[in-house]
């Protein structure tokens, strides 16, 4: 049979399975592909193909992630599944696999477990907008009261971490029954995909967001002025539009008088484009790498924030020793390093390599930032951690 071509006409959503070890995340991922393959919406992918996830590097950190794709009537999905707990922590903090939504897998036989909690908390911290629950292994539970109890526990846990626990769809089923082709197993998978389709919101496309471009380089072109280059992160920039230069120094206003790509002049640059932007009346020395160009008023510079951070283990090339309060590494945001001081919470004496932790950072210079911004922590040019801004402190 010829391989069906995925139609890119449907809206695209990135999703992932999260939850405690052995609750059935990978079995569920396999079951989704096998059930959807029957209607031509996926290539059936077996458990062991997904479980042998390839290693990828994201900002100097090795993460094992399996990617599968499938489609429903309404959407095209890219789905990530990680083999180990540490891979999830790294994946969510680095944003290696951006998640527009998640499927939280909970074993009906065990109920919520420590990693269930940790994944819900991480999802909240890194800004996963919505999730749907799959209560797995219901074929192993004979008592309907027990099922109801587990569902209540899951809803309470979601509410505790700031998700709407009462509203979130909880689908009960068995990934194993679906893999075995049993009708009740398949029915639950179809119900789950309907819930994901309707409950996980459609993400805003990068071009529909406000304009932002991290500055990578600055040139002076005689007779024309100053050109900054970089990749447009979000939004669209048009000729004649007023923009702000934000970060490192006081915010300045300027006007875009030219957009150039591959030596051709354009009317506009949009998300994903590598462009040069000509700035009216801006001097070469007033702009530098590490600042951003942005729509006026859309982003502010900050130097104090709270972060969720994964610290590399020694085996991953990280530090060999823990760090303590007032540790001063470099924080790499977008295109530049800024020195900062780490302030640990009162109850935390130190952070060990291989741990994830929450702490406050004070930078020596402000950076254009918003919650959800990713960064690396570096020491002597090597990456020792990866983090995400969870809260800005003014």
From Swiss-Prot:
Recorded catalytic activity of this chain's protein: GTP + H2O = GDP + phosphate + H(+)
GO MF annotation, one: translation elongation factor activity
EC number: 3.6.5.3
Region described as G3: spans on this chain: 81-84
Main localization (coarse): cytoplasm
Sites where the protein binds Mg(2+): 26
Protein name: Elongation factor Tu
Species the sequence originates in: Rickettsia felis (strain ATCC VR-1525 / URRWXCal2)
Name of encoding gene: tuf
